[in-house]
């Protein structure tokens, strides 16, 4: 299959470094399944192509389909950054969330990630034939945003105030989910399936089902 050819080429040329998901730099999942550390791919290609640093997704999985993977630790955001801004700045909760989602810059990350992959596909040493290029273009391309599971009792022993705020925290998480999904809706394009916001368990299931 063409994906195996691309994967093997990427590994041989040191474009692709595979790591367990739990070892990917920004991972919020403790999964053993290996994927490509796409941040490393970005650094290697940008240096080789004499390009300014681009954005990229955190991971890439070439197995059955082309899966771009971005990790977002929402628990970490709500426990630290959100609480800090709520206490230190005169900003409404929803505006803090919207600002954070804008800063995620999903559009730039997937656009640059597609460019990085295209750079490899057009590499002279890979020498894909026309029918192989057509096959590659027909393969499904997915963009998954992976969130960690809601942890309402995080640091409860050291901060009992979280117990009273638990319902609010869950409410804010739901608002964040909606804002992320809304931002992903505008990214639908011909060569990309509708981006999805999923959790670690859903990611694990998707990767298991990939052939």
Residue ranges and their predicted role:
Residues 1-54, 204-211:
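Basic, amphipathic N-terminal segments that precede the first structured/catalytic domain
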Residues 28-29, 46, 57, 61, ...:
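Generic recognition of cysteine residues
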Residues 47-50, 57-58, 126-134:
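Catalytic micro-motifs at enzyme active sites that drive phosphoryl/nucleotidyl and oxygen chemistry
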Residues 54-55, 108:
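Generic alpha-helix structural propensity
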Residues 55-57, 67, 141:
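Residue-level detector of short, conserved catalytic/binding motifs and their immediate flanks
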Residues 59-61, 65-73, 113:
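Conserved catalytic cores of phosphodiester-cleaving nucleases, focusing on short active-site segments
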Residues 74-152:
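Catalytic cores of nucleic-acid endonucleases
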Residues 132-207:
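Short, low-complexity, polybasic intrinsically disordered segments
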């Amino acid at each position: 299959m063409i994906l195996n050819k691309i994967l093997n080429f990427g590994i041989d040329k040191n474009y692709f470094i595979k790591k367990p998901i739990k070892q990917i730099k920004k991972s919020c999942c403790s999964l053993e399944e290996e994927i490509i550390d796409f941040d490393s791919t970005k650094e290697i290609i940008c240096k080789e192509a004499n390009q300014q640093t681009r954005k990229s997704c955190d991971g890439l999985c070439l197995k059955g389909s082309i899966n771009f993977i971005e990790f977002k630790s929402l628990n970490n955001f709500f426990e630290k950054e959100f609480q800090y801004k709520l206490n230190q700045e005169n900003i409404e909760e929803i505006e803090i969330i919207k600002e954070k989602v804008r800063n995620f810059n999903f559009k730039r990350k997937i656009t640059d990630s597609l460019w990085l992959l295209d750079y490899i596909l057009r590499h002279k040493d890979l020498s894909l034939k026309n029918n192989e290029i057509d096959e590659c273009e027909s393969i499904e391309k997915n963009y998954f945003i992976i969130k960690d599971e809601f942890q309402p009792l995080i640091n409860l022993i050291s901060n009992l105030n979280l117990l009273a705020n638990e319902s609010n925290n869950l409410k804010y998480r739901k608002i964040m989910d909606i804002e992320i999904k809304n931002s992903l809706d505008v990214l639908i394009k011909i060569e990309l399936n509708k981006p999805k916001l999923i959790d670690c368990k859903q990611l694990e299931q998707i990767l298991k089902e990939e052939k």
